[in-house]
Amino acid sequence: MLITLLLTLALQHPAQAMGFDQDKTVHHFPMTANGGSVEVNATDASDEASRSAIRMHLKHIADAFAKGDFSKPLLTHGEMPDGVAELKRLKSSIRYKYEDTAQGGAVRITTSDPDALKAVHAFLKYQAREHHAK
């Protein structure tokens, strides 16, 4: 019951789940031959509050993902994203590296494991679909 309530509240208020207003940001989830990235940028280059909140959120998820903790995406989307079971199982073969960008930040995800790569790509495709990323 409590988990259902928390998920409902998170879905109604995604800014609290992620720490920033999604209407003031743009998400990108590019895939590469060895992984991909989660990129979030403030739409207004002068919006320091959004840039700061984006960076804090992405630093947190880079740390959490490296430990196999995908609770933030669960809270944000109300379901576990595609690929997460494999990302958890193969966490020792995946690297998550946070980087600042001019208008926000990025989590670079890399692996040389073919099964982990499939999981990373499944996760990024799910995120792109959910965030209506272009």
Task: Please report, for each region that a protein language model flagged, where it lies by residue.
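Intrinsically disordered, low-complexity terminal tails/loops enriched in metal-binding residues
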Residues: 8-134
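Sec-dependent signal peptide recognition
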Residues: 1-7
